[in-house]
């Protein structure tokens, strides 16, 4: 049965949901359309029982943008889509993070969601539509997913909020926020802003949530009309007496451990000992009590001998102990207050050859961040369904396994690394100077050397410091902080600068970055239902206070960007040439510009409007390139010296020398040298470069439209002294 529903979102936007027409062999499928952008989402979940020792939910979300959706061919030699782009990976993460917490606890069936953009009007970004389509597919399926989720994008122009703004409108908007949530609560938030206030952020979330409720209501209607009966799902239930036995051997030790302010590695080792000892003790107890005969007659008692179930409940105890310590005693694992920031240390300029560098350490999280400056040629070309563009500021984040004391694969960039780098990049790019003020391409690389929570926000701080150390005239320093939440019923605590364990065992990971004037980027993931706006407001205010504290420490390390670029950074010089002279500078097949860059040891970039950017580590090379280019685009002038190229050599006449592109002159045999009898072929070869001076210009008597140019080499050298003069000397 085909189900179709149109939802009036206001502002002339109508969202269309359809299911039952495409991909009917999947467990669930749906098509969501906005104007002429359409996405197809499918979901399939395995029905086989997961392995007995599995304790995680293997959810895979894939997002693909088909070039055919926009009537385009893929770029490059191979004309078909290949590995996912960064944009596709970021969109998949956006959908995954909103959906994952809404699956029931203990559901461990391998599940795959594939979102495909099948039509793009190049006005609407399909990422949030993919989230809606995925939720619709789940609601129509038999998979135990009961609470619909919707995602929306919110922008703002001239103070007015926009729902699902066009890509072109986002260029004028002072915010680009993606919000994911159910009808009752917000579960995901991500976006970039132009230094907005906390109150403005709350206003945007509330505006988006009103639209989310409408879309969720339509999904419930879809479920009632065409939804399949849900699978029977029974999570593992541990008997009360088994829970008591586990608590008896584990709870006291875990509580004692929680109140000790230990380093990450030491805490992990001691916690692992508790798990091993407690699990072994419980297994010994029940193996002695439950014989094979008893187990054969009572197969339900197998749970008592299930080591995975035992460890899962020990984990629940560990989680409860930490949360209760925070809620009851306002005490954290490392002994800090709820709003206290870990100690921060900063070192600048420690990498000699980098154009800017910073080592930012906050507690047990450390980022080594470097800045590299380049020319427009170094910009990243992004090939998407929308217009291709050059990206002149980029931040790359690396998370090697040694940063958490592990051995791991060193291969391609992970989705997590792409996501964290993108968040840090969005946080800083709002303060990056415009191209006309600072015509460099900037690449910031954050290598995480240690990690115990909030490494992406350390990358924001380190990236800002490296940029300032490198002399990038940013508008204002940016700092980032990760906030956490512990909530039990009506009791809750908001945590500043969370540890890895507080993220893992807590209910929220809310990263907020910004300047002294406002927020520039945020990312929030919620693991619980029922998060009200009072908690979000408290988290944002506490994050603001933490951000001010971090910015103060950063200001003590470096107050403003350095006035000069680093020793090894390229110096950029910009000049303007006539558009019709661009060909003269480039030369046939690029030979002129290649020769220029080689001779002056520079990089030269020419824009379509005639803007020439010259990059050189030395001012001498840059000046030489400027002089050469100005000469190339100027008209021939008597008295000027040119670095000409010999085009023809004739012993009876002299040589024909090209002094400017398409301009040749005669170097007469009499102007070669002060020495008589010199043969041109003895000192000149075709293709040779030689300095000549233009000594005369005259109209060609045979063709007045042409000009004859007379050149000289000998006037550039001193004539030899006479014999009498030599003797007197």
Curated annotation (Swiss-Prot):
SUPFAM superfamilies from the xrefs? Eukaryotic type KH-domain (KH-domain type I), Nucleic acid-binding proteins, Polynucleotide phosphorylase/guanosine pentaphosphate synthase (PNPase/GPSI), domain 3, Ribonuclease PH domain 2-like, Ribosomal protein S5 domain 2-like
Positions with a binding annotation for Mg(2+): 503, 509
The UniProt catalytic activity note for this protein reads: RNA(n+1) + phosphate = RNA(n) + a ribonucleoside 5'-diphosphate
Q: What does this protein do?
A: Involved in mRNA degradation. Catalyzes the phosphorolysis of single-stranded polyribonucleotides processively in the 3'- to 5'-direction.
User: Known PANTHER family for this protein?
Assistant: POLYRIBONUCLEOTIDE NUCLEOTIDYLTRANSFERASE, POLYRIBONUCLEOTIDE NUCLEOTIDYLTRANSFERASE 1, MITOCHONDRIAL
**Does the UniProt entry include the keyword Cell cycle?**
no
Domain KH intervals: 570-633
This entry carries the following GO cellular component terms, namely: cytosol
Protein's UniProt name: Polyribonucleotide nucleotidyltransferase
One Gene Ontology term of the biological-process aspect is: mRNA catabolic process
Query: What EC number(s) does this enzyme carry?
Result: 2.7.7.8
| Transport is among the record's keywords | no
Where in or outside the cell it occurs: the entry states: Cytoplasm
The alphabetized UniProt keywords are: Cytoplasm, Magnesium, Metal-binding, Nucleotidyltransferase, RNA-binding, Transferase
């Amino acid at each position: 049965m085909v189900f179709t529903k149109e939802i009036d979102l206001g502002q002339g936007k109508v969202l269309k949901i359809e299911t039952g027409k495409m991909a009917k062999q999947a467990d669930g499928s749906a098509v969501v359309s906005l104007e002429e952008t359409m996405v197809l989402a499918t979901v399939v979940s395995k029905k086989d029982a997961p392995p007995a020792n599995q304790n995680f939910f293997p959810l895979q979300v894939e997002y693909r943008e088909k070039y055919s959706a926009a009537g385009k061919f893929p770029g490059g030699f191979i004309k078909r889509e290949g590995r996912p782009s960064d944009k596709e990976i970021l969109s998949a993460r956006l959908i995954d993070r909103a959906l994952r917490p809404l699956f029931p606890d203990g559901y461990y069936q391998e599940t795959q969601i594939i979102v495909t953009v099948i039509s793009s009007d190049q006005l609407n970004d399909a990422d949030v539509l993919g989230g809606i389509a995925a939720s619709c597919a789940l609601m129509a399926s038999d998979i135990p997913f009961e609470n619909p989720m919707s995602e929306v994008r919110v922008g703002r122009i001239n103070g007015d909020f926009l729902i699902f703004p066009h890509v072109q409108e986002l260029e004028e908007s002072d915010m680009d926020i993606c919000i994911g949530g159910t009808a009752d609560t917000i579960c995901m938030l991500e976006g970039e802003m132009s230094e907005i206030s906390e109150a403005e952020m709350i206003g945007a979330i509330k505006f988006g949530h009103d639209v989310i409720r409408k879309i969720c209501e339509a999904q419930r209607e879809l479920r009632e009309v065409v939804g399949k009966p849900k699978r029977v799902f029974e999570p593992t239930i541990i008997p009360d007496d088994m829970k008591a036995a586990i608590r008896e051997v584990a709870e006291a030790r875990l509580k004692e451990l929680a109140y000790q302010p230990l380093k990450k590695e030491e805490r992990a080792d001691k916690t692992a000992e508790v798990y091993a000892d407690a699990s072994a003790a419980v297994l010994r107890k029940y193996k002695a009590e439950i014989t094979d005969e008893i187990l054969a007659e009572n197969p339900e008692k197998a749970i008592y001998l299930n080591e995975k179930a035992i460890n899962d409940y020990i984990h629940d105890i560990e989680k409860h102990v930490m949360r209760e310590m925070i809620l009851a005693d306002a005490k954290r694992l490392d002994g800090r207050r709820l709003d206290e920031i870990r100690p921060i240390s900063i070192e600048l300029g420690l990498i000699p050859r980098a154009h800017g560098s910073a080592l930012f350490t906050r507690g047990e999280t450390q980022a080594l961040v470097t800045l590299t400056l380049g020319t427009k040629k170094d910009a990243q070309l992004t090939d998407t369904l929308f217009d291709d563009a050059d990206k002149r500021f980029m931040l790359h984040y690396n998370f090697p396994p040694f940063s958490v004391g592990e051995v791991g694969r060193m291969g391609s960039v992970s989705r997590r690394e792409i996501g964290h780098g993108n968040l840090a990049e969005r946080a800083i790019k709002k303060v990056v100077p415009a191209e006309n003020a600072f015509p460099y391409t900037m690449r910031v690389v954050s290598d995480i050397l240690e990690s115990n929570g909030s490494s992406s926000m350390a990358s924001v701080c380190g990236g800002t410091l490296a940029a300032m150390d490198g002399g990038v005239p940013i508008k204002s320093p940016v700092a980032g902080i990760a906030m956490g939440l512990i909530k039990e019923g009506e009791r809750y605590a908001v945590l500043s600068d969370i540890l890895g364990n507080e993220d893992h065992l807590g209910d929220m990971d809310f990263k907020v970055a910004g300047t002294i004037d406002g927020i520039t980027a945020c990312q929030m993931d919620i693991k619980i239902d029922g998060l009200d706006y009072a908690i979000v407001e408290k988290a944002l205010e506490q994050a603001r206070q933490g951000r001010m504290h971090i910015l103060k420490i950063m200001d003590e390390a470096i107050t403003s960007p350095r006035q000069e670029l680093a020793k090894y950074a390229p110096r950029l010089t910009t000049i303007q040439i006539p558009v019709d002279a661009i060909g003269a500078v480039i030369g046939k097949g690029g030979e002129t510009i290649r020769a220029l860059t080689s001779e002056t040891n520079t990089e030269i970039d020419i824009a379509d409007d005639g803007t020439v950017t010259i990059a050189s580590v030395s001012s001498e090379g840059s000046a030489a390139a400027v002089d050469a280019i100005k000469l190339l685009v100027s008209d021939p002038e008597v008295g000027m010296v040119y670095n000409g190229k010999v085009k023809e050599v004739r012993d009876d006449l002299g040589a024909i020398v090209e002094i400017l592109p398409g301009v040749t002159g005669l170097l007469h045999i009499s102007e070669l040298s002060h020495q008589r009898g010199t043969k041109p072929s003895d000192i000149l070869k075709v293709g040779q470069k030689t300095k000549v001076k233009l000594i005369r210009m005259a109209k060609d008597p045979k063709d007045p439209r042409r000009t004859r140019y007379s050149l000289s080499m000998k006037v550039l050298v001193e004539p030899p002294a006479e014999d009498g003069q030599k003797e007197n000397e």
